[in-house]
């Protein structure tokens, strides 16, 4: 919406709050007088997406541009590192290098994993998060997380996978996590969440393998004074069956 002061100076409704309802030209108080002529001019404009330098080729009418940019699939991603609010943003190749070089996150090529988590004094860990590994699988990147937190008053551990890309593309993949010992095991299968979702949002939705602390310590064996968990898993791509139209798994070795 385009507004103007009593002297005819114009500015947009977004900027009105930034100038504290005062015209930046004449300092008169701004009302809600719309400049319809300028709005008509704005409606006729077609502008490219501001993320064109990242690959977006779309062109939009002026008033649709901001709405598109808020959801543009080429918009930069926030750093997915868990455990700190890292302010870095960028495309996927940049963030993979950033995670490796600045956060010292391990990177591996392959779609299967086998991790062992060892923590002394696990009863003292109420809120902790670890981004353990970034996997390069099927030409895409995935982040494996492991967290300790409370559900109500119950201490739990949780493992989950995030996809370094958009939500729609994440739906093409599935993953499994498994933990166990002494002839018992827990399993989880699901779809990785996009890194568009903050890791806390994923954690708080309980979208992953959740292990109660007493079960985790049972799996650890011994005197239950040390956490020793082995978590294995794999990632696969759901492919369309050309004959029956049914999704069949394509498992990367």
Per-segment meaning from a language model:
Residues 1-253:
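Signature of small Cys/His-rich zinc-finger-like modules used by ubiquitin/SUMO E3 ligases
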């Amino acid at each position: 919406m385009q507004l103007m002061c009593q002297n005819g100076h114009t500015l947009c409704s977004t900027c009105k709050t930034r100038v504290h309802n005062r015209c930046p030209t004449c300092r008169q108080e701004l009302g809600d007088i719309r400049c319809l002529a300028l709005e008509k001019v704005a409606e006729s404009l077609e502008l490219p997406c501001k993320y064109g330098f990242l690959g977006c080729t779309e062109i939009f009418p002026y008033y649709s541009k901001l709405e598109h940019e808020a959801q543009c699939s080429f918009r930069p991603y926030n750093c997915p590192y868990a455990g700190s609010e890292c302010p870095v943003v960028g495309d996927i190749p940049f963030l993979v290098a950033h995670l490796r070089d600045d956060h010292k996150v391990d990177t591996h090529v392959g779609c299967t994993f086998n991790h062992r988590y060892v923590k002394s004094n696990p009863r003292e860990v109420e809120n902790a998060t670890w981004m353990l590994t970034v996997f390069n699988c099927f030409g895409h990147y995935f982040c494996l997380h492991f967290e300790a937190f409370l559900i109500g008053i119950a201490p739990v551990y949780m493992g989950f996978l995030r996809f370094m890309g958009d939500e729609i593309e994440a739906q093409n993949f599935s993953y499994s996590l498994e933990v166990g010992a002494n002839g018992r095991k827990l399993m989880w299968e699901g779809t990785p969440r996009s890194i568009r979702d903050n890791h806390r949002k994923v954690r708080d939705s309980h979208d992953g393998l959740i292990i109660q602390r007493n079960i985790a310590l049972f799996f650890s064996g011994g005197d239950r004074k040390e956490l020793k968990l082995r978590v294995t898993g794999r990632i696969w791509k759901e492919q369309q069956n050309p004959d029956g139209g049914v999704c069949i798994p394509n498992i990367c070795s």
